Amino acid sequence: MIRIVRLLQDTKEKIYMNKIYEALKNKKAFIPFITCGDPDVATTKAAILEMVKNGADLIEIGIPFSDPTAEGVVIQGANIRALAGGITTDKVFDMVVELRKEVTIPFVFMTYANVVFSYDPEKFFAKCSEVGIDGIILPDIP
């Protein structure tokens, strides 16, 4: 856990937090969530672009995991379908790269510690920074 915190304390941390703060300050926010890859990446990308067009202030993008214990049955099902359809963490990163050509609002990843650790935490957080992810939610880390 300490290693993860250190990785997050790079020079871009303040920029990302300011971007999230600016998107949310002094107002109610529209923050939709989508599981990437359910039913496929192209549909996920199109849905995210529609969310932006319809006023999303920040979008949570779920990176699928095989045992999403913090989720209800609907999002659990979306995770299983996305994984069965061949989604990978790298495909999620690739989609974000494409979206960042058009979208400037904050993106936050929602995933599980196992996804981060199996990718390699240092590489995962470096890649998040590289592609323009503004925050990360790991519900299974206290």
Question: PLM features: residue spans?
Answer:
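Conserved, mostly hydrophobic/aromatic
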Residues: 32, 51, 62, 128
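Catalytic beta/alpha-barrel core
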Residues: 84-87, 132-142
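Active-site mouth loops of central-metabolism enzymes
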Residues: 30-44, 108-120
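Glycine-rich, proline-tolerant flexible connector loops at the mouths of alpha/beta enzymes
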Residues: 39, 58-88
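N-terminal amphipathic alpha-helix/helix-capping segment at the start of soluble metabolic enzymes
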Residues: 15-33, 96-100
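Short, Lys/Arg-enriched N-terminal segments with co-localized hydrophobic residues
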Residues: 4-16
